[in-house]
């Protein structure tokens, strides 16, 4: 372990000295610009963030070795409320935040310094950079910056961006529903809340008023107002406390406390009159405003008084929870008696079907509940699944029945809005915004929806902006490809976005400076800023002060607008430097790839696309997005309480950089949304295998060895070159786990087999080539080890900038590789045969008759043309000179063993391979091995031979 750490420190220092990863424009050379979302700097990096940035680094290193001029910059995100909130908590002496800092290893004497938000930013940007340097990231650090007004140069860039958006008509002002923290009195964006609450936004719902005989209003919040005609009762939680509140000075409502807060923050006057236990409401009678029917108030344990209004309208024909709760009450009359109700109150209540769905026999809700085996209203996971299925099918496929009166015959999607308008006209409904589930602020407070007046927002709902975003998505590459559909769907659903907050770190809105641009909105086109950050972040070198960065400067640099001489005169930036900045931007843009975690698809990545289309011409829109899942540790979500929360710096201390990188890749670093699973045992083994590889290189590179040609050399040379081709394709697809498995594990397996087949005597030039190729193929994954091996070979320069191996297509022979697979299969099968037949001293290996190869090839060609297996097998009967009975037997054999069709070795190659391997087979099996053909041999099992699958016969011959 210490040896590998010394190697890593050595090469990190060498890279720094050589300024190896600093990238400047080189006209005429292919460029590749790749980025990772800048992380929020209020804590140390953990294995999750390390996983995603590793995928960026691997792609950057690979492209560099492919000859590209690669730019991989990195900045830091400080915008938003969490840092301000944490600093305030330190000032207040909050023991939880003090403990968090201590647990991070912050010295006691330094904790008071965290009272200042600026110190948080400065401390954690340095910590992140140090950890990423130790991790082996190939970053151009000259372009480093952090966000907010603490960095005036970046703030000037953000101000320019929003002036352009306003100029183009993509910014508006008005009333807007936002997620609101009542404790900190601020808007709560995705970055202001724990990850599990990201992406949850206000949704419009409808409150339907059921008026009671007692003079109270029982308001039921629903997302399905069209089902009001099927209400059989109302639900309340018997053990919850409700409020009797005067709403808008007109009515007294029964509601939960969360609903009271939400109503008050959405323009309603709410006066709390008294509190009342839910059980006191049971048995009361209310009137359905849709049809005048009287229905009872009943108990249900699934009701959450803190969601919606706490009063639920029961539609058992179309809501799984309602159906199951009603059936439970019918089965358990003792529950009703417990609350002083007679069982007869539910006996007459039956589901009222309102909607017909194609292919549903009877009530869809009953079908889905039974299919999932739901037994009670506490089977929440199954009920949630059933609810999603029922709601989706009824919304998209359902037709309203005669039980809905004037709405009969309408599609559900059409009826929904018409029912709301009808109820509103009758004074029986109002619209409200709410959250579909509870959402907490990072400060720990429960949030709700508030209508903010005079709020600035981005007009993502504008048809012309959505059209641009759609066009960009159609032009882009996505890894994996199927996420394109997610982006398309989110673009369609995206609503206007409140982009300003108060009391946070960030950039003030240039025309209304009491507002600050929130964290997801100042992080959309900063990739463009990277291209000039080496100038703007270093006034000591280039003389560009923040106040010189006027909107006209950015107009020229990023859009080519204006005369550079005039812009220079007005800004004070030398014309030559302005033109150099413009050239630098045009060289690097557009962004070639952005790699991110899947959690940023619904917000950051979609915003990134929208903003690029709004500001830049089409030729400068992003080219590709790669997405990956999150990281589990030993199969479980990382959690401090479980003891499996691993910081990157801890991993680097325990295993070093390359072993940590290795284990992160094998955790699941292919393109896709599946979560990766980091196994500490894999990191342990990586420490050993990387050390062993360095020993192997030192002991074997350049040593004298065999020079004459053997059969197995052709196979290993083919494997070497076909591996390069496969790994190259996988790297282009960002399928890094599969690439590493091919590049290391399968190639090592091939080398071990090569050693066995060659009697421990590899050919000298192939041994050298193998060591070179193996080292270069693992260089993006374990760069420090690769550098050390490269130096041990006596090679010049760095492995990091050496040329990626190119496959020699003339040396790749699928036939030879298939023939050697046959040898390996024969060895494996023969062990099994000999273990079953004791006492045998001879193994007869029979290669199939020549006509079978021709027949199999005919069948294979037919399959490649798209013929069915049945049609393709008929081709076997058409081969010239084939006995029909023999062909029929072959067809039966192929039906049982279709894998034979995947083999590609001609008979002559297969026969040559087996005869060459006879000596190895004899040595490993301990018996005499005879290789013969089906035509000339005498084995009683010779007729069973198939191309690529020789027949084996063990016997005792003696002598």
Swiss-Prot record:
Renumbered residue ranges of the record's region Disordered: 933-959
Lineage: Archaea, Thermoproteota, Thermoprotei, Desulfurococcales, Desulfurococcaceae
Cited SUPFAM superfamilies: Anticodon-binding domain of a subclass of class I aminoacyl-tRNA synthetases (SSF47323), Nucleotidylyl transferase (SSF52374), ValRS/IleRS/LeuRS editing domain (SSF50677)
Subcellular location: Cytoplasm
Stated family: Belongs to the class-I aminoacyl-tRNA synthetase family.
Principal subcellular localization: cytoplasm
UniProt binding sites for ATP: 640
Underlying gene: leuS
Protein name, UniProt field: Leucine--tRNA ligase
Short sequence motif named 'KMSKS' region, residue ranges: 637-641
